[in-house]
């Protein structure tokens, strides 16, 4: 919870800086660092894919001029987002489609894979919203671009089945709350 609060504070500081201010680089670094250091992140699961195919695929959405995977720094923020959306991310049985990704899987599988695919992320929402690229997150954190895969995932990648690989990592590493 403390890391989530620090992250929100860093985003607020970043948003107050004028574009001509050189301190934005430092503020950006601290946002990336706090995000990278979260023990877990939360994603909203696409309801249609979950109900029709049993897939736990995170929501890819648009916000103003940014598009990316919607990620939350705390369960509370994800839950508030889901509740604001009505039934859009709630199953008929009342299950909120919120998934958790642990730090290891996020850092070592999702971020490098998303960076390779040139995806962006939308972190949190409203006043705490921060949008950026997974590539820049990797670069700022000086992290490896390689991602850890098991044999099944390696076979999917060798066969060129990127969608199958993505579905597999989501199935294995996203836990519904």
Give, region by region, the residue ranges found by the protein language model.
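An interfacial alpha-helical scaffold signature
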Residues: 1-177
């Amino acid at each position: 919870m403390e890391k989530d609060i620090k992250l929100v504070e860093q985003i607020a500081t970043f948003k107050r800086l004028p574009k001509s201010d050189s301190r934005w680089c430092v503020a950006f670094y601290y946002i990336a660092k706090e995000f990278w250091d979260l023990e877990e992140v939360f994603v909203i699961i696409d309801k249609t894919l979950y109900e029709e195919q049993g897939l736990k695929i995170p929501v890819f959405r648009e916000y103003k001029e940014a598009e990316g995977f919607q990620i939350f720094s705390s369960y509370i923020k994800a839950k508030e987002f889901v509740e604001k959306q009505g039934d859009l991310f709630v199953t008929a049985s009342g299950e909120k489609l919120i998934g958790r990704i642990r730090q290891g899987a996020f850092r070592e599988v999702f971020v490098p894979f998303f960076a390779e695919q040139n995806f962006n992320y939308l972190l949190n929402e409203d006043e705490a919203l921060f949008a950026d690229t997974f590539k820049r997150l990797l670069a700022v954190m000086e992290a490896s671009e390689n991602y850890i895969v098991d044999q099944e995932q390696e076979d999917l990648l060798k066969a060129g089945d990127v969608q199958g690989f993505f579905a597999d990592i989501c199935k294995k590493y996203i836990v519904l709350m």
